[in-house]
Amino acid sequence: MPSDRKILITGLTGQIGHPVARYLARDNEVWGVARYSADGSRERAEAIGVHPHVADLETGDYGDLPTDFTHLVHFAAWQGPAPDFDRAMRANAEATGLLMAHCRHAEAALIASTNTVYRPNEDPWHAYLETDPLGDPTAPHSPTYAVSKVGQEAVARTMARALDLPTTIARINASYGPNGGLPAYHCDAIAAGHAVLLRSPDQSPYSPIHEDDLAAQVAPLL
């Protein structure tokens, strides 16, 4: 794990971002940007040793956020239920470029994408490769999510070249842990009497990764 670094992490209030920030804050100065609009969200960040900073990634309003971060870890994402493609591109793709420009002096950046960028394979047990075809949304809860994350990857690749900023794009699949995750979402839906949304009416196998194991992968990815 990196140590004595100044790390900016987004998506801190999300299911994945919080445990990753907690892991990194053990030996680093970690700043977490979010709107912190929910009651107790700022205090929850401070409790794990993170410096909370209010920012709006979608508009690019960072306030007085420093620019001397050594590493950028970008987990924030917008997943809207409506087919608002303009907002999805602005929040997921354009926001990534603006954030990388703000952290242009960093040593490295980790941009979190998603497994839903892949075009569905006829074999539900297919193990996807990075070179597999992209496209065709597979996130039933958000019709704009997959296409906007493909756009995000394109923006991140362009900014990495333009800024000469070493960047890793990680296509993250299902995760779980005390902070929630896919199994918890399904259980919550069942308990509430709601339908569990699947990628297809056929088999939908997953291989969820625990949030602690995911956090341990951040250092190698950086």
Cite the ranges covered by each PLM segment.
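Conserved catalytic-core motifs of eukaryotic protein kinase domains, centered on the activation segment
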Residues: 43, 81-88, 120-125, 181
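NAD(P)H-binding glycine-rich loop region in Rossmannoid oxidoreductase-like domains
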Residues: 39, 50-91
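NAD(P)-dependent short-chain dehydrogenase/reductase
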Residues: 123-125, 154-206, 211-215, 219-220
